[in-house]
From Swiss-Prot:
This is Perilipin-5. It comes from Ovis aries (Sheep). The keyword Signal does not apply. Residues 1-173 are annotated as: Essential for lipid droplet targeting. Residues 1-20, 420-456 are annotated as: Disordered. Residues 1-108 are annotated as: Interaction with LIPE. One of its GO terms (cellular component) is mitochondrion. Keywords: Cytoplasm, Lipid droplet, Mitochondrion, Phosphoprotein. The lineage of its organism: Eukaryota, Metazoa, Chordata, Craniata, Vertebrata. It comes from the Eukaryota. Phosphorylated by PKA. Phosphorylated on serine in skeletal muscle at rest or upon lipolytic stimulation. The modification Phosphoserine is found at S2, S148, S324.
Amino acid sequence: MSEDEAAQAPGPSLSEQDQQSAVQRVAALPLIRATCTAVSEAYSAAKDRHPLLGSACRLAEHCVCDLTTRALDHAQPLLSHLQPQLATVNDLACRGLDKLEEKLPFLQQPSETVVTSAKGVVASSVTGMVGLARQGRRWSVELKRSVSHAMDVVLEKSEELVDHFLPMTEEELAALAAEAEGPEVGSVEEQRKHQGYFVRLGSLSTRLRHLAYEHSLGKLRQKKHHAQDTLAQLQETLELIHRMQCGVTPITPARPGKVHELWEDWSQRPLENGRRRHSQAELETLVLSRNLMRELQSTVDALETSVRGLPPSAQEKVAEVRRSVDALQAAFADARRFGDLPAAVLAEGRGSMARAHACVDELLELVVQAMPLPWLVGPFAPILVERPEPPPDLEALVDEVIGGPDPRWAHLDWPAQQRAWQAQHGEGTVLSGNIPEEEPEPPSRPKHTLMPELDF
């Protein structure tokens, strides 16, 4: 065809130019063109390497071309009818392509440039991640060193506190001395330094539980001895009253108590009008008996609180002691002389005191043989009771924190405070009418608030 004929030949319509322009723009994108070229080269190379595959591919190409031609022939009337809609879609596609090229500039760049940029970004990211990993490793090493030092300090301080507040028992000291006699045995501190944290923590926990258990048993034994001493004095008082009612001279025991001392002091007093006043001695004896009962009742209260988490059998032992004390206290409440106490009441009281003495022995034996108890080996809060309001005697229970001891004896320890109180109140005053004033109650021992279940 000559140039004139080509110039006179009818050209494509505007919509066809727009449609061809949209398709051409998509196909002309460097990234799309490079991808299509790579796929075409791989397809051609595969056909050349495998003759059978090449024949099959050429047959498939021929079939696809025929099908496409026939489909276009049948769809041509429909495409001509939808020409305005296709033009609109083509226009929208061109606008979307413009926006896409603005947002993704690399679509207009050659594939080599895109790959090079991607490699640079990946390399920069990897370098940054490697730097962060190295920095994190340095931080982890520093953190590990700090945690290691902190754990050493905490464990050393914990061991010092345990040694201070719960010192070693005689058995542990003997075992430590036996180990020290062996060859090349380091000190306890040196051995602790060579142990791991979990080993030291486990041994500290086991030792703390053992020492707390021994400390609690020691407190319970002290309460047991105190209760049995008070029970023995009450038993002695009941026996003396019984003998006096029968007209028998009391026998002084090997270890005379307060009642026998009172009667000996009374017997050495000068006569009044040729006789001694028995009523005065009887009244003082009854007052002393009531004081012993109140002291025993406070001891039973402490025992009852300490066995709250024990099995019912142990709680029943303390309850039996309380019933005996309450019954005896009710019998002595209105007595003004020995004649007000029936012989049956005295006999029953002596029997109940003997049973209470046995119950206290059985209680300690039950605690020692039955178990290490949860409230002894930890946790150190066996029973938490929610109360709607603070108890009325809260200040007395936490006097070590919010109350404080008597300011006169604040600088003294507990045994010295007891001696000071006894020196001040050793001689009770006598009221008018020959009725002695009741002896003021001695100061109670401050109760610790950090581990109250260890104070029975």
